[in-house]
């Protein structure tokens, strides 16, 4: 669950920084100097929107390591680490992928995969998961994460987020301009945006950004089903994945940092719309009904 929420929070932070920078540099004054230039605004929104999204993608692996304190296994220190690295290597070869970095972090049961591309990825598992599951179940979890990489889920979510960012920036500024025009005095003929524009655009950018996360989480839930199915294919059997999900259902799944929530093996939210993962029961049912 970690992967997506980390991506969302990083994306929001980058977007706000880029937006503020654009204001400081006078881009908004250029766009609104002689009325709102819709064409230029849309181009500006796309540049900032996709730029922020891809910057977040490039930072994803570094941010994941930092936020969890994950330790990349350079030289396995014990038999468990040897097995972990070998298992990820075998699964990656089956999927036709380059070997990802393998990491361990302290925490309750969970795991995640992230990275800017299939050839520069990271698979991390918690000490809690390694201690509470048997090796067949852990292998299934690793297969699920490798399937995420193979499916290109981070790039897919980046493109979705880029489109949503574009609309967030565009709509927030259109509405902010309308509010500013309404509040502006009839005697003000400067044409420059006032304080109402600055405040409104920031407020609406945050509000629409939160609403956009609902769409991202919807796609994240769909990708979880695909990763479960991909794990079953890599293992040649759906039962280990089902057993792993059932085991997770009986454990207190680890809460990954908010910014990483959507890339874990387990996750969810208080509200279904903001949940990065489907219910475990639904995932098990989907695997059991698959042919």
Curated annotation (Swiss-Prot):
<keyword id="KW-1133">Transmembrane helix</keyword>
<feature type="binding site">
    <location>
        <position position="224"/>
    </location>
    <ligand>
        <name>Zn(2+)</name>
    </ligand>
</feature>
<dbReference type="GO" id="GO:0005886">
    <property type="term" value="C:plasma membrane"/>
</dbReference>
<dbReference type="InterPro" id="IPR050083">
    <property type="entry name" value="HtpX_protease"/>
</dbReference>
<feature type="binding site">
    <location>
        <position position="148"/>
    </location>
    <ligand>
        <name>Zn(2+)</name>
    </ligand>
</feature>
<protein>
    <recommendedName>
        <fullName>Protease HtpX homolog</fullName>
        <ecNumber>3.4.24.-</ecNumber>
    </recommendedName>
</protein>
<keyword id="KW-0862">Zinc</keyword>
<keyword id="KW-0812">Transmembrane</keyword>
<keyword id="KW-0378">Hydrolase</keyword>
<feature type="active site">
    <location>
        <position position="145"/>
    </location>
</feature>
<dbReference type="InterPro" id="IPR001915">
    <property type="entry name" value="Peptidase_M48"/>
</dbReference>
<keyword id="KW-0997">Cell inner membrane</keyword>
<feature type="binding site">
    <location>
        <position position="144"/>
    </location>
    <ligand>
        <name>Zn(2+)</name>
    </ligand>
</feature>
<feature type="transmembrane region" description="Helical">
    <location>
        <begin position="38"/>
        <end position="58"/>
    </location>
</feature>
<dbReference type="InterPro" id="IPR022919">
    <property type="entry name" value="Pept_M48_protease_HtpX"/>
</dbReference>
<keyword id="KW-0482">Metalloprotease</keyword>
<feature type="transmembrane region" description="Helical">
    <location>
        <begin position="4"/>
        <end position="24"/>
    </location>
</feature>
<keyword id="KW-1003">Cell membrane</keyword>
<comment type="similarity">
    <text>Belongs to the peptidase M48B family.</text>
</comment>
<keyword id="KW-0479">Metal-binding</keyword>
<feature type="transmembrane region" description="Helical">
    <location>
        <begin position="199"/>
        <end position="219"/>
    </location>
</feature>
<dbReference type="Pfam" id="PF01435">
    <property type="entry name" value="Peptidase_M48"/>
</dbReference>
<dbReference type="GO" id="GO:0006508">
    <property type="term" value="P:proteolysis"/>
</dbReference>
<dbReference type="GO" id="GO:0008270">
    <property type="term" value="F:zinc ion binding"/>
</dbReference>
<keyword id="KW-0472">Membrane</keyword>
<keyword id="KW-0645">Protease</keyword>
<dbReference type="GO" id="GO:0004222">
    <property type="term" value="F:metalloendopeptidase activity"/>
</dbReference>
<feature type="transmembrane region" description="Helical">
    <location>
        <begin position="159"/>
        <end position="179"/>
    </location>
</feature>
């Amino acid at each position: 669950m970690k992967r997506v929420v980390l991506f969302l929070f990083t994306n929001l932070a980058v977007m706000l920084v880029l937006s503020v920078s654009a204001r400081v540099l006078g881009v908004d004054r250029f766009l609104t100097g002689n009325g709102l230039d819709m064409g230029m605004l849309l181009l500006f929104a796309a540049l900032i929107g996709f730029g922020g999204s891809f910057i977040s993608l490039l930072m994803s692996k570094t941010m994941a390591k930092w936020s969890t304190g994950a330790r990349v296994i350079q030289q396995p220190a014990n038999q468990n680490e040897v097995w972990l690295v070998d298992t990820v290597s075998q699964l990656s070869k089956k999927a036709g992928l380059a070997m990802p970095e393998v990491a361990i972090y302290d925490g309750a049961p969970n795991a995640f995969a992230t990275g800017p591309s299939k050839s520069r990825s990271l698979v991390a598992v918690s000490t809690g998961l390694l201690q509470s599951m048997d090796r067949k179940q852990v292998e299934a979890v690793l297969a699920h994460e490798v399937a995420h990489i193979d499916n290109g889920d981070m790039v897919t979510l980046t493109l979705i987020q880029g489109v949503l960012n574009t609309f967030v920036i565009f709509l927030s500024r259109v509405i902010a301009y309308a509010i500013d025009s309404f509040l502006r005095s009839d005697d003000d003929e400067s044409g420059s945006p006032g304080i109402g524009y600055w405040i409104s655009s920031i407020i609406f950018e945050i509000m629409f950004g939160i609403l956009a996360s609902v769409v991202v989480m919807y796609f994240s839930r769909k990708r979880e089903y695909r990763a479960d199915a991909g794990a079953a294919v890599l293992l040649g059997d759906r039962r280990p994945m089902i057993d792993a999900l059932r085991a997770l259902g009986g454990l207190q799944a680890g809460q990954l940092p908010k910014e990483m929530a959507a890339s874990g093996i387990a996750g969810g939210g208080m509200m279904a719309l903001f949940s990065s993962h489907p219910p475990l029961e639904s995932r098990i049912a989907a695997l059991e009904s698959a042919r």
